[in-house]
Amino acid sequence: MVADLLCMVGFFATVVLIFSRRAKRFQTNHNRALDALAKHHGFGFNPNHGWNATVMNGTIGKHRCDVSFETVRRRSRRNRSRTYLHVSVSLNGPSQLGLHITPQGFLSEGLQLPDSLTGNQDIIIGEQAFDEKYRIKGFDENAVRAHLTPKRIHAVLQAQASLGPLHRLSLTDQQVSVRFPGLISDMQTISNTAKLLVWLADQFEA
């Protein structure tokens, strides 16, 4: 019986060791790929990001771009965590509207009580596709409506269509950004996303 127990412990220890080595190998290879991407764009690279900080930053066109990781700890007995990748592009002429545009709906917000009960703000712009897809907040509703011209609304919808439904596009007074639902191993996807956000920032500053 003791021998069986030792065999079982040895088996599980071996499995843990294998997965640990694979995870370490993935992290090493992923960091190398990120470093190569940073060098391609002439960005500064932070090798000590620890999966919860800025990884690289620099300039594309006229805009500053940041790529970062965010690790969120889940409240559970297993103490699980999830890591997201963020790509953000700063606006050169930030507005003072208190603008905050984020995806809405069950996939983005989870179960929510009606806004009439929670008092959660959602400015209606008057463009059905845009209003249904995004929650819009700001200090002055009329100023926000004036700021979100048909051209800018179309640019946001076009960018979201290029990204896909699982990539969380959001906008504020200061920046446009995308949150990926996990680590992205395809460096070209990260590069293309940064360029897309630069294009979107240009549409808001045209």
Segment roles from a protein language model:
Residues V9-L17:
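Hydrophobic core of alpha-helical transmembrane segments in multi-pass integral membrane proteins
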Residues M1-V9:
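Feature marks short, highly hydrophobic, charge-poor N-terminal signal-anchor/signal peptide-like helices
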Residues F26, S68-F69:
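Residue-level signal for functionally critical sites in structured catalytic/ligand-binding pockets
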Residues N31-D66, R73-A206:
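Charged, low-complexity intrinsically disordered regions
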Residues V16-H40:
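Transmembrane-cytosolic junction motif
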